[in-house]
Amino acid sequence: MSHLLPFPRRRLALACLLASISGASFGQTQCDVAQLQQSPDLATAISSADYACYSGWFSASSDTLNNIYSEASLSRVQVALHQAVQTYQGEAEQARAIENLGEYVRAAYYVRYNAGNVAAFSDLLGQQFAHTINAFLANPHALDQGREQVGAMKSLTLMVDNIKQLPLTMDAMMLALQQFNPETAKNTQWVDGLNNLFRSMAGHIANDAFYRYLASNTQHIDMLEKFANDNAWALDTDADFLVFNALRETGRLIASPDKATKQKAVQVMQRVMARYPLGSEHDKLWLAAVEMLSYFAPEALNGLDLPQAKRDLAARVLPNRHECQGPAIIRSQDLTPEQAAKACDVLAAKEADFHQVANTGMQPVADDHNQRVEVAVFANNDSYVDYSAFLFGNTTDNGGQYLEGNPADEHNTARFVAYRYANGEELSILNLEHEYTHYLDARFNQYGSFSDNLAHGYVVWWLEGFAEYMHYKQGYQAAIELIAQGKMSLSQVFATSYSHDTNRIYRWGYLAVRFMLENHPQEVEGLLALSRSGQFEQWAQQVQTLGQQYDGEFARWLDGLEVTPENPDTDPDTPTEPSDGVTQLQANQSITLSGKAYSEKLFYVDVPANTTHFSVAIEGDGDADLYMSYNQVAHYYDFEVSKFVDGSNEEIQFAADASGYVKPGRYYLSVTGRGRYQAVNLTATIDTAAPTPPTQEQDDLAPVMLQSGQAQHLTVHQQRYAAVYVPEGVSEVRIWLSDLTSSDSQGNVNLYASREHWPTPEQHQFASRYAGSNQYLAIPVEQAGYLHFSLNAPQQGDDVEMVVYFH
């Protein structure tokens, strides 16, 4: 939802939530962290920075919390930001300065959050930033729609979730919603700025100050329902996410311990279900309402046959079924029989490769009955987000998910859920090979369930890194480019948990797996012998030993690593050197050409990383044609793509891939005269986005339903929920929370419990708040009913195992 697109509607991926903004330089500034530490005027240096600075700000080390990210430094930045807001008159340069200051503040909070046991910034500092945000939203230019102006608005409204001060800013942010109309909705970047209200509402779940505020301001629930009803027209536009999130986050308020807030939110969800019934055009709102009610107020769904509703929806949304000759059964929304057969071929090839690489002997681990795997493929990310969670219980802020279930259960259904990132003749199924590798790895390499695999840590690097390796082999450019940003030791990578960031989990995991497979295959054989027999404690011990043993070798190996494309003949790694006859074409600048029939003029254009749009067009008189190739000179007789027609008006557009960006590199083009042509304008249009700053990892807020004696693995970044139904005859429930990460983990997850409502750090009946993430509760029980649990990470989160026992 970060793309600026006009009507008519073209659905946007819900995962794309951050800004895509111009990569053009704002100023030649010295803005990396080391330079800022030496700057005599920090606020001025930040204000004049360019977009390229953001990545360094967000990836800064925790040492910066003692200098440029200290509370004193941020206090001075707050003063500068407030002054910039007070003098803001809607000019682009002013807006850029505000956005820079805002992103710097967000980066500081991000670094502090990821630093572990470091004191939080004070509430007073957060309140000062909140007052600055309110002052900005009160400015008559706050909601201007220029590119830079929208950037400023988005940065400050997104900051609310960083500083956790929504009770102070919600009135102003609710007021901004009133500017949403059919005209402003055309700018989805601007709409995404309004959507930061709902991001903040989700980020304030279990926040006691927020719940107290809402208990005294329940009119906001009425206003959000009215907003959604009044703007139902937007459900047929690219701005539909704003209406959807208004209702979804209203539903999440059911988790409030305040009875009046909960009751009002439940009533709104029930009205949503009546207005948008399952099977209607916008039934994803019905699904959102059912999701919230089933999580936080299941009693409100009494009488609704959810299993039948799921069967009906699955039959409508995934009507196609194709059985592969191997273990896969493909259910899809829009794959043709030919495409489904091609997917089977891809999976079969990957399976053969897997058995060779992992040396499995094609022998499953003991007690694994997952002989088949269901592959559910949605047509696009929108359908994946709309329907998959309801149908299969997966999270949707990802590129697909493998759901192993209980492999020891003969009636279990192993499944991975995926979606297509394009709907042409190609398969375009995101992470198809990655997720299928998870199935194969679990069946042939990992004894027991997912929780069993994670019970002693030191395994995430393999689970995700091996799946990435099987997909990319030696061609994972993004992972290799990551090395230049700073090396990790092998021991560090081996200690990775799911509470770490995606670069560490997937890309560094890939590098560790590739290193071990290439340099120490016998050690890998030894590790897999342990995991196949369920010896995960011994696995963890051996991995720690190997990390210490090979740290130095791994560092040297990284120095010599290069990308090897899988098909070098068809996708050359090095572009053809331009000859004297090939001229560089500058992006976004037109040149005028004239030529005779059969004449040819050759050009090349370099497309940088983070390009969101790339097209080349000719327009003029006569009859010229356009031909193009990637990384090799294009001619009218030797080219990769052309859209030639009669006349001299042609355009070639290059689609973004699954990452959202056009493939970077050198593109060659030929303008050839089929007849004489004159006054033909040649233009290469390139739009780039600033590298998206990282955001705090998001929790799955769906409560986990526990069973007595069955351990559950939970990754907690900030907040998770769990519940257990206690039957008659139980007098005590005992709950253990165990840290699954390495011994030097700085994570801290606290455990809260209540009988009547979802607990918070302030409103609960029972609590365990020992240092670290090992917690224990013994709760007396007098009658049957639910126990509700909240797992809260006040600073750095953790991977934990949760288990309950009835006595």
Swiss-Prot record:
Catalytic residue positions: E435
UniProt entry keywords in alphabetical sequence: Collagen degradation, Hydrolase, Metal-binding, Metalloprotease, Protease, Secreted, Signal, Zinc, Zymogen
Needed co-factor(s): Zn(2+)
Transmembrane segments: none
Note on cofactor: Binds 1 zinc ion.
GO molecular function: metalloendopeptidase activity; zinc ion binding
Reactions catalysed, as given in the entry: Digestion of native collagen in the triple helical region at Xaa-|-Gly bonds. With synthetic peptides, a preference is shown for Gly at P3 and P1', Pro and Ala at P2 and P2', and hydroxyproline, Ala or Arg at P3'
Record's signal peptide: 1-27
Principal EC category: hydrolase
GO biological process, one term: proteolysis
Residues that bind Zn(2+): H434, H438
GO CC terms of this entry: extracellular region
Subcellular location: Secreted
InterPro entries: Peptidase_C_arc/bac, Peptidase_M9_N_dom, Peptidase_M9A/M9B
Location of region: Disordered: 562-585
E.C. numbers: 3.4.24.3
UniProt-listed PANTHER family: COLLAGENASE, MICROBIAL COLLAGENASE
Similarity comment text for this entry: Belongs to the peptidase M9A family.
Free-text function comment from the UniProt entry: Possesses gelatinolytic activity.
Name recorded for this polypeptide: Microbial collagenase
Origin species: Vibrio vulnificus (strain CMCP6)
